[in-house]
Amino acid sequence: MAAMALTASLAGALAGTASAAQQAQPSPSQKDTPAARAVAAADQAVDSGLDSLVNSSQEQYERRLVTPWVKDLYSVSYERSYRGLPVVGGDAVVLADGTGKVRALQSASSVRIDVSTQASVSAKDAESTSRAKLVSVDKVESSRLVVRLKDDKPVLAWETVLSGRTKTAPSKLHVFVDARTGAFVDSYDEVVAGTGNSKWNGPGPVTIDTTNSGSTYTLRDPVRTGLSCADYSTGTVFSKSSDSWGTGNPTSKETGCVDLMFAAQKQWDMLSQWLGRNGVSGNGRSFPAKVGLSDLNAYWDGSSVTIGRNSAGEWIAGIDVVAHEYGHAIDSNTPGGTSGQESGLGEATGDIFGALTEAFANEPAPYDTPDYTVGEVINLQGRGPIRNMYNPPAVNNDPACYSSAIPGTEVHAAAGPLNHWFYLLAEGTSPGGGKPNSSTCNGTSLTGVGVQNAGKIFYGGMLLKTSSMSYKKYRTATLSSAKSLDATCDLFNKTKAAWDGISVPAQTADPTCTPSGQNNDFSMSLSPSSGTVQQGASVTTTVGTTVTTGNAQSVTLTASGLPAGVSASFNPATVQSGQSSVLTLTATANAAPGASTIVVKGQGASLSHTVDYALNVGGTQPGNDPPDIDVANVQAHLTQFNTIASQNGGHRRAGSAGYTQSLAYVKGKLQAAGYTVTEQNCTSCTYPSNNLIADWPGGPADQTVMFGAHLDGVSAGPGINDNGSGSATLLENALVLAQKNPTMTKHVRFAWWTDEEQGLNGSEFYVNQLSSAQRSAIKGYYNFDMVGSTNGGYFINNVNSTTAAPLKAYWTSLNLAPEENTEGQGRSDDYSFQQAGIPTSGYAAGASARKTSAQATKWGGTANAAYDPCYHSSCDTTNNINATVLNRSADGVAYAVWKQAVGGETPAQDFSVAVSPSAGSAAPGGSTSATVNTATVSGAAQTVALSVSGAPAGVTATLSPTSVQSGSSSALSVQVGASTAPGTYTLTVTGSGTVSHTSTYSLTVTGGGSCTPRQLVTNGGFESGSSPWSATAGQTLETLSNLNANSGYAEKSYDLSQFAGQTVTLKFTGTEDQSLQTSFVVDDVTVQVS
């Protein structure tokens, strides 16, 4: 059993209460962290289509990787999709800081895609074309339909991944074949080959980290997860009974592994201490290695490193070789990967990491000294180094200067200019100290920044890397990196001079830099970034600006790309960066319906930025009559689901690529229509994947009506009736609701569930995450599963309930005489809500049960045959849909939406205002902050002027901005003067628009000579883990064990008044003295002051 002692020891305030309970509590939210602020800023930039990013109704960005860097900077990378298909070559990356400012961004391409997604060539035919690109193919790893975007030209293509061999080396080749014509498009190889130093490291004996288990030691790093070294022939990690490794013989594989582990561990440490990177992968992992390849080579294959030999049979696991190969791994695990890189960039990246690791290890002669040559001591074929970074022509006459010939140059030779740039940046042209001189291509003399700073600048450029990276894009990326690292512009200017020194010309995307305090720049955002306007009406969005560097400046706003019949106005048209403006888009009665992209430009003193607004012009006015849903549109969605399934193994099972692309298709449609869309990751699902939740703005949130359908299918087939029919029906209803934009009397939420086929897991996960208040807010849930069965019936869940009334009323109006859905009871997602006490109903047309004679007489169809003869089968395609049943189901959903949640009159504009958190404290001389949130309650969004009153003498409260569009927020900052009297004060925040609303903030000013009786929560959150607390003296309050198990908290108090003016620590000690484990929860340490 476990025991736990609570000890109050000399080491808090005046009187403390500690509570402990043996029950789990959730951890506090981590939303307001530097990383979260950076990610939120990056997400907003992507959502707004900032500068070269694309905001289109057909295209989406999905966040993939967040990499912390130095100086509170974060690299946030995104992959792009088009109508549910991955866009290879369309990725982007945003560099943002912990204060929530966008510092730089780079996009692989800013071209908007408009291609057919229907393949004319089969995946099998594309595979045959792809196989011809390798000498031998061991395995077809995967095949998928993508949009290949290269040189700003989009092509629908099959991407086939093959493992095998070229004429000289192993290969993992990605081949792209035009899916319309069958022509080869391009390819790239994950396997990157190189060579290097096999000299032993020293002076000996060197120390390496190994793993010990009992009496066995293995060459597996216990700290650097994933790093190990194995015999290439057997694949077995080296192990032995002692922790003494290697023979000193360079032909010994074990010695080669010692050299590899030493070099890889030094590189890991360099990444952490110099560059701020968490391991080779960036998330605390490395990769395994093998020694013993018979080739005169070494390579990275996408998941491991393999070391070969030199002509003397010595294993080439020296520092610069090992660091070079793991440099390829870093290249693969930074934004953009290595796909489509210009020739030479990958090899030079490996060489740069080799030079950095040599410099970090700083070994003396005769070992591998820091020298900026590659493989200088291995003498691979008796000719010395294989590359020279300060003088590339010294080896094989490699080029030192960039030219238009570089993209077509052999990859190792093409590394010359980038290697030369790195040396010029690190050391300059005449470094002295025994280091070699290096000449520039333009005859200038340069001073270096040092190898560590050069490494930071280059690595920062890698964090802005995209696919199809080029020398010219690296120039822009490293200039942005240098600018972010150094406000004085010294690093920026030297980085620029080094690029000029190898003849890489200036680019239009290059940033500019002036000394600290003068380098003024800003960013822009839109909230929301898309919307629908009816003919004869208007829609608004808030254009936000943020100071990213330097001081605020005047920004003039303009809009372009307006469709015929739509005009734009800004209020105000010019703002100071840091302020916002309201953009109003007004459509005439004759404005052409359809989608378009409005480009909003902000022109500063010398720089400009753009954001994109996705506008949809609707062709009809909102009204109270339920609309007729066009079944052809529903069938079009089903066709898209069918296409997605055929391109991804024939199904859309939860967790599969088919499901992911289906979700992306639905999500893209909803975002373009103006919905607030959320993906919820179902961690408890059989196949972990995402639910999709879409909220239509308007209507009271505490009066919510939900409409749901499961999006997943079984692996046996495309799942078009089960349940593409329900999913497509809801999607089209959601789009029509957005187009009509009627007055909402209730809030409407749509949901597409994952993992239903494995046991209603997605919807159950969602319901279980709801608080009691959130459950109470849902006044009804409607489920739609298999609503297009070919031999279908007309079934309603809980047909005689109040919730079912609108569904029943519509089908009854068609003389369909609907029946209870007995077959589907407990078998679809409505059951999850029913179990939580939420009223439910829904439509179904039947599954594998058989239609009775009476039903066939009433509804038509075949008696004694299954409602759906293709239930859970491969034939559940678009041919397995009864359009009449589907149409009646879709129209019935619209009838229910309108009857349950739509009003008849144009709504009065109204909004709400709330402060979060609603209370805070600060000492005299200190400060605190909160967020003022607004929301549109009814009608259209409106401009809300914000003010704050009630601040006592000495307290200054400010809002930024002081005017927002309802639905946006403002920052409340409270500064407490040094002479402010302690006490609790109420600040009132007032929002004024068509009406006025207020919200309050309770400010507690602490300190002072007097004492107000009150209870202070000194540990209001929940913590897990341990802290290094120590007691110099103390008193045990109580000892607890698992015998004291309690469903609530056991509260203990102690009078600490005797320690007035001193510091007191409460210590909680847990001791395991038997195998039975016991958990304790300690929470809410409070102080009662009197």
UniProtKB/Swiss-Prot annotation:
Entry's family note: Belongs to the peptidase M28 family. M28A subfamily.
Transmembrane segments: none
PROSITE patterns, sorted: ZINC_PROTEASE
UniProt keyword annotations, A-Z: Disulfide bond, Hydrolase, Metal-binding, Metalloprotease, Protease, Secreted, Signal, Zinc
GO biological process annotation, one example: proteolysis
Organism ancestry: Bacteria, Bacillati, Actinomycetota, Actinomycetes, Kitasatosporales
One annotated GO molecular function: aminopeptidase activity
Cofactor annotation: Zn(2+)
Function: A leucine-specific metalloprotease that plays a role in controlling the amount of leupeptin during colony development. Degrades leupeptin into three components, acetyl-leucine, leucine and argininal.
Cofactor-binding details, from the entry: Binds 2 Zn(2+) ions per subunit.
Source organism of the structure: Streptomyces exfoliatus
EC number: 3.4.24.-
Cellular compartments annotated: Secreted
Positions that bind Zn(2+) 2: D722, E757, H872
Subunit structure: Monomer.
Highest taxon above the source species: Bacteria
Binding-site positions, Zn(2+) 1: H710, D722, D785
Extent of Polar residues compositional bias: 513-530
Region Disordered: start-end pairs: 17-36, 513-535
Residues at the catalytic site: E756 (proton acceptor)
Gene Ontology CC terms: extracellular region
Site (Transition state stabilizer): Y871
InterPro entries in the cross-refs: FTP_domain, M28_SGAP-like, Peptidase_M28, Peptidase_M4/M1_CTD_sf, Peptidase_M4_C_domain, Peptidase_M4_domain, Zinc_Metalloprotease_M4
Disulphide bridges, residue numbers: C870-C875
Protein name from the UniProt record: Leupeptin-inactivating enzyme 2
PANTHER family, alphabetized: BACILLOLYSIN
Signal sequence interval, chain numbering: 1-20
